[in-house]
Design a protein with these regions (language model features):
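Patatin-like phospholipase
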Residues: 2-118, 126-564
Length: 564
């Protein structure tokens, strides 16, 4: 053990040798990675026939829906959507411009009667609900929103005092006033309420917020909060803890604190299911809650938002995820042919994120190589453990090293180049007993794996290098885990998944190429979804019973993703 006390830190000579071998191994893996890249570039280079040698998904392995979707033109079909639901996502919300463009081209926005959203999705839902068209919406979202939402007077110097006094860095007043002006242009009143909006337009709007005092999500809607102003609800819904100060709102003599709705429910695809927000007279609170003996059952979330299968197709939802993020819908959404990412633009943000992605790919390759090398090494050790005991002596290790079944490549991956049998034995025999026992071997393999896993997770995990990283990571953790409580496998069939590529939650300062990239992703992802939706509807209409079961089973695949 090295002495960690005092000025002088002593190091175990074995640790020095171990470090040297790890460095040698890293150099070897780097060389292999470069060779892999060169090989892939060679595959991508077209030959005389124009082929690249890269395998594409062939028609023979496409399922019925995919084959049908490839022939669909969404403009030739009608769709049953009446409700739009937008997930929160910060700067990723720029992609909604592309999604709305797709819907407007097909005339679908005009048939929508109910809008809902969280955070950036709350802004989108509200602007559409009060009557902003595509061109107006794009002009609004094309602004530098960072100058609007980040309004701390003294910038970073305001951080500590604002946290202590207001529980957040940015007061959000500039956004509150700006959004009020947007509402006034369409509704004639900055503080138009949910009730006033409903009476004037006949449209319903739902904004999801988090009530900190009651520790639950709340649904701001004409039925639940008729006298609340829309801009107040949107201001609540964008209040990412730490980045923005929360909103304090008094109702019925009780003051509660509200923050970002995405903290608990970032994708409210369920909000228009069931009776809770239904404006039908039979679903009024007076009618539903008069049976007090059944009150607990009625207020259970599964009862309030119980999905009637005949109404499922009325709701269309949108989820956002950057290429580096996980999402429970992502795996299945990205199976849809046509949603694949375009090349990342050569912008400042694009270059940074592209480097991170390359580092991640490199770590994945290293992981695969080392796992294979470890497997090969253990097999050959087992074969040459002649006395079949629980230890390996030097002679047995030497025989393993010389075996044709233990390749030079695997040896160099585990021990680096030019490592002798004696060096390897000294490294493995940590206790200097003259034999390598199972625990010593396991520790070596564990050390190898930990090194790679930590490097790999370093590109997957969220770095918490400061105050804002801390709060962004908390929200991401909540979203990833809490989302499972509000969605089900059947929601896949009414969800558009939009991969925003290199643009993440807080990347508000985008260049024109970044913005165009995200908008294009929103457009093509929506169009692709509509092709699949129409294809499935056509197939179900004309299919026999066995084919109907196969088509319906495509959605149930998500159930395994939800449970994992």
């Amino acid at each position: 053990m090295g002495n960690v006390f005092g000025k002088k830190i002593e190091t175990d000579p074995g640790d020095i040798q171990y470090k040297e071998i790890l460095e040698a191994r890293k150099r070897y893996l780097d060389e292999q990675f470069i060779q892999d890249v060169e090989d892939e570039l060679e595959k991508e280079t077209p030959d005389d026939t124009g082929n690249t040698g890269v395998n594409r998904k062939s028609p023979s392995i496409l399922n019925e829906i995919e084959i049908k979707a490839m022939s669909i033109n969404p403009k030739d079909h009608s769709y049953p959507f009446e409700n739009l639901v937008f997930e929160g996502g910060g700067a990723k919300g720029y992609a909604y411009s592309g999604a709305i463009k797709a819907l407007e081209e097909l005339g679908l926005v005009s048939q929508i009667r109910r809008f809902a959203g969280v955070s950036a999705g709350a802004m989108t839902a509200s602007l559409l609900a009060v009557g902003y068209d595509l061109e107006e919406f794009q002009d609004i979202m094309g602004q530098d929103l960072s100058s609007i939402v980040l309004d701390a007077k003294c910038g970073i110097l305001s951080l500590l005092p604002n946290l202590l006094t207001g529980y957040g860095w940015n007061p959000g007043n500039r956004f509150y006033n700006w959004f009020g002006e947007l509402l006034e242009k369409k509704m004639g009143n900055k503080d138009v309420t949910f009730d006033e909006h409903y009476r004037k337009t006949g449209l319903e709007l739902c904004i999801i917020v988090t009530n900190v005092n009651l520790m639950r999500e709340e649904y701001c809607h004409v039925k639940t909060t008729p006298s609340m102003s829309i801009r107040t609800a949107v201001r609540m819904s964008i209040a990412l803890p730490g980045l923005f100060q929360p909103t304090h709102y008094t109702c019925n003599g009780e003051t509660n604190t509200y923050v970002d709705g995405g903290l608990i429910c970032n994708y409210p695809i369920h909000c228009f299911d069931g009776w809770w927000l239904s404006m039908d007279s039979k679903d009024s609170f007076l009618e539903k809650l008069k049976a007090l003996d059944d009150l607990q059952n009625l207020l259970d979330q599964r009862q309030r938002f119980a999905l009637d299968q005949k109404d499922q197709a009325k709701t269309l939802g949108f989820v956002l995820y950057a290429d580096s993020e996980t999402d429970m819908f992502r795996f299945m959404c990205e199976k849809r042919i046509g949603v694949q990412l375009d090349p990342i633009p050569n912008t400042k943000l694009g270059r940074i994120k592209l480097k991170q992605k390359k580092d991640q790919e490199k770590a994945k390759r290293e992981d695969r190589r080392v796992v294979m090398a470890v497997d090969e090494f253990l097999k050959v050790l087992k074969k040459h453990n002649l006395d079949k005991n629980h230890t390996i002596n030097r002679t047995e290790l030497e025989a393993a090293f010389k075996s044709e079944e233990f390749s030079t490549t695997s040896c160099e991956i585990l021990f680096g180049k030019d490592c002798t049998v004696q060096n390897a034995f000294d490294l493995l025999d940590k206790e200097k007993s003259g034999e390598i026992d199972f625990r010593e071997l396991l520790n070596f393999m564990h050390g190898t794996g930990v090194q790679l896993i930590e490097r790999f997770l370093g590109y997957q995990r969220k770095n918490v290098d400061g105050f804002f990283d801390f709060f962004r990571t908390i929200q991401s953790a909540f979203k990833t885990n809490v989302q499972r409580a509000f969605v089900s496998p059947q929601d896949l069939d009414r969800t558009v998944g939009i991969n925003t590529g290199h643009v993440g939650l807080t990347d508000f300062k985008l260049e024109e190429e970044d913005m165009r990239f995200v908008i294009d992703q929103g457009y093509k992802s929506t169009m692709t979804f509509l092709k699949y939706f129409a294809a499935k509807e056509e197939l179900l209409k004309n299919a026999d019973e066995s084919l109907q079961k196969r088509i319906q089973s495509k959605s149930s695949t998500l159930e395994y993703e939800v449970k994992d």
